[in-house]
């Protein structure tokens, strides 16, 4: 099955599973998706993820994170740069998500990173998504 926007599909699966209070969600794997999952884990939005290698593509099982009263750690996750309209930002125009309460994930020449790290390293890139 071919997707127009595989990253958007991953983010939608995470958003839907989180709002339905599921423990895990399964996503088809790619190197970019694995790196996005690593960033989400480092920033504390998901508990963990497991990469399943099975033949050509594989899959990622993402373990979602909730508070003690079952509120999801991810309030919202939005795709910014889409296949039909790519959004690139320079270092000085990287947005602050909810005044620093959320994160923006960028794909830069130095890899996939959060907005704080991109500002620190003074690199811009493609604004993949925002999470809060």
UniProtKB/Swiss-Prot annotation:
GO terms for cellular component: ribonucleoprotein complex; ribosome. Keywords: Ribonucleoprotein, Ribosomal protein, RNA-binding, rRNA-binding. Gene3D superfamilies: 3.30.1370.30, 3.30.1490.10. Pfam families: Ribosomal_S8. One of its GO terms (molecular function) is structural constituent of ribosome. One of its GO terms (biological process) is translation. PROSITE patterns: RIBOSOMAL_S8. InterPro entries: Ribosomal_uS8, Ribosomal_uS8_CS, Ribosomal_uS8_sf. Part of the 30S ribosomal subunit. Contacts proteins S5 and S12. Belongs to the universal ribosomal protein uS8 family. One of the primary rRNA binding proteins, it binds directly to 16S rRNA central domain where it helps coordinate assembly of the platform of the 30S subunit. This is Small ribosomal subunit protein uS8. It comes from Anaeromyxobacter dehalogenans (strain 2CP-C).
């Amino acid at each position: 099955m071919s997707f127009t926007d595989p990253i958007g599909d991953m983010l939608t699966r995470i958003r839907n599973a989180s709002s339905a209070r599921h423990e895990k969600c399964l996503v088809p794997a790619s190197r970019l998706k694995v790196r996005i999952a690593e960033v989400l884990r480092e920033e504390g939005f998901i508990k963990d993820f497991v990469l399943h290698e099975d033949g050509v593509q594989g899959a990622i099982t993402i373990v979602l994170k909730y508070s003690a009263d079952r509120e999801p750690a991810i309030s919202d996750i939005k795709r910014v740069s889409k296949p039909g309209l790519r959004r690139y930002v320079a270092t000085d125009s990287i947005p602050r998500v909810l005044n620093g309460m959320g994160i923006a994930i960028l794909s830069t020449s130095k890899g996939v990173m959060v907005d704080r790290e991109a500002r620190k390293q003074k690199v811009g890139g493609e604004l993949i998504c925002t999470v809060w």
